[in-house]
Amino acid sequence: MNILDKTYYYFIGAGGIGMSALERFFKSIGKEVAGYDKTQTELTTELIAEGIDIHFEDNIDLIPAGINPENTLVIYTPAVPKDHSELNYFLVNDFKVMKRSEVLGEITKHTYNIGVAGTHGKTTTSSILGHILKVANVECTAFLGGIAENYDSNIILNGSKYTVAEADEFDRSFLRLSPKLAIITSDDADHLDIYGERDEVKKSFQEFAAIVEEKLFVHKGLPFEGAYTYGVDLDADYDAHNVRIIDGHYVFDVKTPNGSLTDVGILLPGHHNMENAVAALAVADYMGVPHDKIKEALSTFVGVKRRFNRFEANGKIYIDDYAHHPTELNAAIRSVRELYPGKKVLGVFQPHLFTRTRDFAEEFGQSLSQLDSLILLDIYPARELPIEGITSNWLLEKVNLNEKIVSSLEDSLANIKKQDFDVLLTVGAGNIDTIVKPIKEWLSEA
């Protein structure tokens, strides 16, 4: 089956960040795109404005009339429950039904695919790489797991000879890809609800590395043989060094296997983003992208929404970040401390998933203890049911701070207003993003 032969593409879970990139791709090649999601969001509103027909009630009567088993591909995410009426309607009536990861694998397998994997950093790294290739006018489509600020989109469309795909370890989705090149930014344990043991996560990354056809690029220190390494001051194959801060931004030189680049500048804050930039630079250099184009792209990449987005008003600094794993929290807090030494930092954290909170409770406690004060929100369940005893009050006991409280999301802004802080940091992967705009409005008025 040629996946591009259908007329209609119907998405169950249409508001998901990975799903919507596929919707935009099919729309861009002239296909009819429709779908369902349980929640109306800013993203679904944008998709509807782009001509994608989305409804928000699980009701087979709302499926567009022209859809039939011959002309339609149905795409769903693993988060969709087994008793979903529309999904079962399509299964019973012999529609072709595929997971998002399978579809991404089919779209990219006939291209020169570059997979970007890793427990942390893959969205930013794939977005930077997609931007470099766009600036260099390489015929490439990049499927992203976040909204790249330069394009206000989670897809960069510029031809289909090459593809960049965020290679997600959840549900072992990345094993559906056929990458010629790949980056692995990290292999930390996560998704233990899927993998069970921490070693199983690392084993899965080894399986991904084994399917890379041409060359693998990994952060220096990761256990992958035969790969190019990258890092910052790590004497890696691609190594950033002579790091300095000019006008508030990182500037550095990069040693490569065959030469060097000097005075490379990035706009993104944080040591981890310097590493992400070097990873993307390494692949672009290997692909033969001219160094002046690489430097131009890195100096103009603005960032990804909810990846350390900064806002300043009336003497207060506000940063919003997607961090939802202890390693990511450490990176975000480290970046705040680097940028704003001596400032009082208030963190607002929404734990994501009961299983992740349980499995990494000690690490979360240590990470959050690096703040000056903490508002800990209720756990965002996503696809999970509650686990007895695993609550935000339980997690709060593991945080070594004098100033700490638990709050509902609804009461969070009122609680923030009562706090004394110089820097406010909101972090989490659930629906904490719904308070970002109200916080900015309040800070602007204060």
Residue ranges and their predicted role:
Residues 2-8, 18, 25, 29, ...:
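Nucleotide phosphate-binding/pyrophosphate-handling subdomain across enzymes
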Residues 31-38, 215-220, 346-349, 371-381:
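Short internal beta-strands
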